[in-house]
A protein has these predicted regions:
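N-terminal loops that bind phosphate or other acidic moieties
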Residues: 1-54, 58-287
């Protein structure tokens, strides 16, 4: 019996950074294929719509791995399939082929960022380093991404300008891939969650607002949940405290108080292990 509700999936579950050790992070070899498998399962269940959360991905493959799992193929000049189409193999790809399942329902992407796919604010430049991309490799990743993005646009009959759509760079370009191949619609993730939990009324009645993130930086203020919450609270003239493992903000608005909870000498791995104690200590010290 076909389901009558929507399905919810996310990239972090199948293609996320949390699934890898630090030394395993390498966007040349990670793939979103598993995300496509999750979506296939939702399609098989007969859902009428899919909400895809695209935070926390370990990939920079433009969503090609997920699209590959769902039916698209990527061929070399001899007509042989390259699968999965990870960035390390992109130089071999000459053409995409195939289509997604005919019964693919509407896909809505809950997206917390407004980054385009390419450029200084793009997927690789902003989020590549946390996924293991070396600074010296950024130009090569950018060039490869631009070529594959153009191939996918041409295959789907979409304008190359799709590459510049705000949010297309989310999750290493997974948003771009699904916008291009599945006509996916982007939803501001922070707005979606805020509406679901009626955050506006809670903010209005609050005295102070406390939020947090692993690393609070300029990208946090480009649509991510904690940054969006802080920005709205400041608009309501609330005092906001942000507790984060690391703080790296270029400009700090008035009434926004930032607290880095991790000692400078502590390793990232130890910080993860000690996060609960560090946060408790920092809050007790402040309040």
């Amino acid at each position: 019996e076909a389901a009558t509700a929507g399905g919810v999936s996310d990239t972090a579950t199948a293609s996320g950074l949390a699934l890898l050790e630090d030394e395993e992070r390498d966007p040349w070899h990670t793939t979103s294929y598993g995300t496509g498998e999750l979506i296939n399962s939702a399609i098989e269940l007969g859902v009428e719509a899919i909400l895809l959360g695209v935070g926390g991905s370990a990939t920079n493959d433009l969503g090609l791995g997920a699209l590959n799992a769902m039916g698209l193929s990527f061929l070399d000049q001899n007509g042989d399939a390259i699968s999965p189409p990870i960035p390390d193999t992109w130089s071999q790809i000459s053409t995409p082929t195939g289509t997604l399942p005919a019964n693919t329902p509407p896909i809505h992407i809950a997206c917390d960022v407004d980054n385009p796919l390419l450029g200084p604010n793009g997927a690789a430049a902003i989020y590549g380093p946390q996924k293991g991309l070396l600074a010296a490799d950024l130009p090569r990743m950018e060039a490869a991404s631009e070529r594959l993005a153009a191939l996918l646009c041409d295959h789907q009959g979409k304008p190359h300008g799709t590459i510049n759509t705000p949010g297309a760079g989310a999750a290493g370009g997974i948003a771009f891939g699904f916008m291009t191949a599945a006509d996916a619609q982007l939803l501001p993730g922070a707005d979606f969650v805020a509406a679901w939990f009626d955050v506006e009324s809670h903010l209005a009645s609050s005295d102070i607002v406390i939020t947090g993130e692993g690393r609070f930086d300029d990208s946090s203020l480009r649509g991510k949940g904690p940054g969006a919450l802080a920005a709205r609270a400041l608009e309501l003239n609330k005092t906001v405290h942000v507790f984060a493992g690391q703080i790296d903000l270029t400009s700090v608005p008035e009434k926004l108080h930032l607290h880095a909870i991790t000692p400078a000498e502590m390793s990232l791995k130890e910080a993860f292990r000690s996060a609960s104690q560090l946060l408790t200590s920092a809050i007790n010290d402040k309040f």
